[in-house]
Curated annotation (Swiss-Prot):
It catalyses: 2 reduced [2Fe-2S]-[ferredoxin] + NADP(+) + H(+) = 2 oxidized [2Fe-2S]-[ferredoxin] + NADPH. PANTHER family: THIOREDOXIN REDUCTASE 1-RELATED-RELATED. One of its GO terms (molecular function) is flavin adenine dinucleotide binding. Keywords: FAD, Flavoprotein, NADP, Oxidoreductase. Binds 1 FAD per subunit. It comes from the Bacteria. InterPro entries: FAD/NAD-bd_sf (IPR036188), FAD/NAD-binding_dom (IPR023753), Fd--NADP_Rdtase_type_2 (IPR022890), Ferredoxin-NADP_redctase_2 (IPR050097). It comes from Streptococcus sanguinis (strain SK36). Its EC number is 1.18.1.2. Pfam families: Pyr_redox_2. This is Ferredoxin--NADP reductase. The keyword Cell inner membrane does not apply.
Length: 322
């Protein structure tokens, strides 16, 4: 039988990393299980260079920097970390729970699920032969390589607006969105309108023109009208969001609401001893932000400790008094 842990955290993104660190402050024996080959979740893999604006105390923090700071914080303690392991099943046991993954079985007294939106892949651009072009991208890495290029960004949410603003500093940039209004933070939209980004609204991509495996032009068509334009480009970035999959979540006996785990004010799920924090959980008034998830993590940890040791107070000493 495998070693018994106090708290096993499913998910190694920002919320999972901070939950693990905080659990160590409560002197818990902690394990992290993640299906990805590295820690950090979406910020580390999908937008390592994108600036994150909703983490308190930082005005210019990238996904990579956030991940590195959280990992460095966690490295002050010994944490068992299991990567490339997909959770297949969770079953109640005498000591707590048995977690079966694609690699092993894990024994734990309590569980904190911090898996974000689950497995994720970008929503594809649905135009003929789109996937055959090498200069069509869904992620940005090493933004400096696009300096001096013609860049077209598709989308109207935070990622599209933020990337358009980032590219504008180094490249000739256009942003194409199907509506006149953007779904991004108001502050970012004001920056966009004051920038040199060429805003194309309300237009949708209608055709790709290319040669030798690369797109040379994007044809866009007016949503309600007959106008069309041909935009020259060197690189096309698609920011239509992500399709997420919660995998076997529905089979773990947890009450769900629209593919998210219902929790109470203790971050406790419908199964005693299992908690959830971050984007994977749901409650009335829930806002999906990294900052929100980081705040939910200590609540989940403290109540998990109280589940293990009912005689201990849920409210611990403040870290400043330790």
């Amino acid at each position: 039988m495998s070693e018994l842990y106090d708290i096993t955290i499913v998910g190694g993104g920002p919320v999972g990393l901070f939950a693990a660190f905080y659990a160590h402050l409560r002197q818990a024996k902690v394990k992290i299980i993640d299906s990805l080959p590295q820690l950090g979740g979406q910020p580390a893999i999908l937008y390592p260079e994108k600036k994150i604006l909703d983490v308190p105390g930082f005005t210019n923090l990238s996904g990579e920097e956030l991940t590195q700071r959280l990992i460095e914080q966690l490295e002050t303690f010994q944490t068992e970390i299991c990567l490339n392991e997909t959770v297949l099943d969770i079953v109640k046991s005498d000591d707590g729970f048995t977690i079966t993954t694609s690699q092993a079985q894990h024994q734990t007294k309590t569980i904190i699920i911090a898996m974000g939106g689950g497995a994720f892949k970008p929503r594809a651009l649905e135009l003929d032969a789109a996937e055959s072009y090498s200069n069509l991208h869904y992620h940005v890495s090493n933004i400096s390589q696009y300096a001096g290029k013609k860049v077209v960004v598709l989308g109207g949410g935070d990622s599209a607006v933020d990337w358009a603003l980032a590219f504008e500093k180094i490249a000739e940039t256009s942003l194409v969105h199907r509506r006149d209004n953007f779904r991004a933070l108001e502050h970012s939209v004001e920056e966009l309108k004051a920038s040199s980004v060429e805003i194309k609204t309300p237009f949708v991509p209608s055709r790709l023109v290319g040669e030798n495996g690369k797109i040379t032009h994007l044809e866009i068509s007016q949503v309600k009208g007959e106008e069309s334009q041909l935009l020259p480009l060197d690189h096309l970035f698609v920011n239509y969001g992500f399709k997420s999959s919660v995998g076997n979540l529905k089979d773990w006996g947890l009450e769900l609401n629209r593919h998210k785990i219902l929790v109470n004010s203790k971050q406790e799920t419908s199964v005693p001893g299992i908690y959830a924090a971050g984007d994977c959980c749901s409650y009335e008034g829930k806002i999906d932000l990294i900052a929100t998830g980081l705040g939910e993590a200590p609540t989940a940890v403290n109540n998990a400790i109280n589940h293990i040791y009912p005689d201990q107070k849920v409210q611990p000493k403040h870290s400043t008094s330790l």
